[in-house]
Amino acid sequence: MREIIARALKASKADYTEIRLERREASKVVYRGRELETADVTIDVGGIVRALCKDGGWGIATFNSLEGLEERVEQAYQCARAVQGEPIELAPVPPVEDRITVELEKDFRGISLSEKRRLIEGYNEILLSHDKIQDTHAVYSDTFSRIYYANSEGTFIEEERPLVSIVLVATAREGDNVQRGHEALSLPKGFEAVEGREELAERLSLIHI
């Protein structure tokens, strides 16, 4: 990734260029009642290029693919050239290199989608086992993002951001009386953070009617 970004920055004709990029891996499993509604894995890439021409101004280009990144840099440069404004001088800032990584006890990227499905299915079944609960919505999701920032002055920063979540929603009914409740958990940790959380489902199942 660093080589791709560096190559795009090197191709820039602007006085100053910066690229912010995010690559996000995500998985999601959703139950609605007893029906498995969603089970998928996605990988997304996107970001923004900012270019400065000192005798013009700032130009911006966005992207959602690494293909053609150099073209997006050129587009930002052309936008900057088209801007009419006062000359701009940036304050001198020494280049920074940093890499912020995380160590997950149980990296959810190494857990199969079927195991994630079994986990949220188990919590959903706890809710459905109670007679008064008529409908449920149970969601497992995780995301692992890598955030990159680089500029033409030599700064390069990479940061990892994990997030794992479960959301449980239940609707209980007794006659005309309907109550809805939910429990949720979202933490910047690994798969272990959402294992053994049966108490969330049990607590939610005690909706007072």
What are these regions (language model features)?
Residues M1-I207:
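Active-site bordering "gate/hinge" segments
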